[in-house]
Amino acid sequence: MGQHEVTARLSELTNTFIERHHSSSRQRPCIPLNEDTRYMLDSPCVEHVDEEAGVFYWTPRPHMDFTLFDGLEQGLEVAIHPSITAFYGSYWSDGLWCSSPFGEISLIQLWNEDDMETLRENLLGHAFQKSKRRQGLTFFIGLTADDRIVTVDNHSGEVYLEEAGRPPQRTLAASLGELLRELEPTLTPYTG
C-alpha cells in the first residue's frame, strides 16, 4: 500500500467526518475551551476561538510531511513501512472515532508539532518493547473502545489487533488502505 492510497483514504474519511459534523450541528467540530484544552490552541487545525462560548473550532488540515520519521528510522535502524508514514504524515487533525466491522476504533492523528514529538517517543518505546519481547515490529495507529491496540506490521503492512505487551491476536486487514476503506467516521468526540 503506497503513501498515495493511504493519504487519499484519510482525505475521504476526514471529509466525511466534516460533512457529517456539519450536517448534524451546522458548524465545524469544536472542543470546549478550558485549562485542560488551552494547550491545543497551538495547532494548524484551529480555525476560530470563541472565548465567549468557551469553545474553539477546528478542521483537519493537510500536512504532507513524509519525512517525519526519518530520525526514528535512523534510531531503530529500520525503514518504517510507507503506509505508516503516510498515515501520520498526511493530516494535522484531532483523532477520529470510526465504526468498523470489528467495533469502534479511534484513529490517532497529529494535532501539532508537540504531538508529533510525543508520538515519535511513544513509537520508539513501543518498538523497544517489541524487540525486548522478541516480537515482530508493529506500530500503533489507533485504539479500540475496549483499549486494544490497532497496529500495522512494519514488514508486511498488515493491520492487527493487539493487547499491550502481547503479540498480535487478530489480523484486521491485509493493508492499512484496506482497513481505512472499511471505516466510517462517527461524531463521537475524541478523548485520546
Curated annotation (Swiss-Prot):
Annotated InterPro entries: Syd (IPR009948), Syd_sf (IPR038228)
Which one Pfam family would you cite for this protein? Answer: Syd
Sorted UniProt keywords: Cell inner membrane, Cell membrane, Membrane
The entry's localization annotation reads: Cell inner membrane
- Output a single Gene Ontology CC term carried by this record: cytoplasmic side of plasma membrane
Q: How does it sit in the membrane?
A: Peripheral membrane protein
Q: Organism's domain of life?
A: Bacteria
Q: Any idea what job this protein has?
A: Interacts with the SecY protein in vivo. May bind preferentially to an uncomplexed state of SecY, thus functioning either as a chelating agent for excess SecY in the cell or as a regulatory factor that negatively controls the translocase function.
Which NCBIfam families has this protein been placed in?
PRK04968.1
Sequence similarity: Belongs to the Syd family.
Q: What is this protein called?
A: Protein Syd
Q: What is the lineage of its organism?
A: Bacteria, Pseudomonadati, Pseudomonadota, Gammaproteobacteria, Oceanospirillales
What is the gene called? Answer: syd
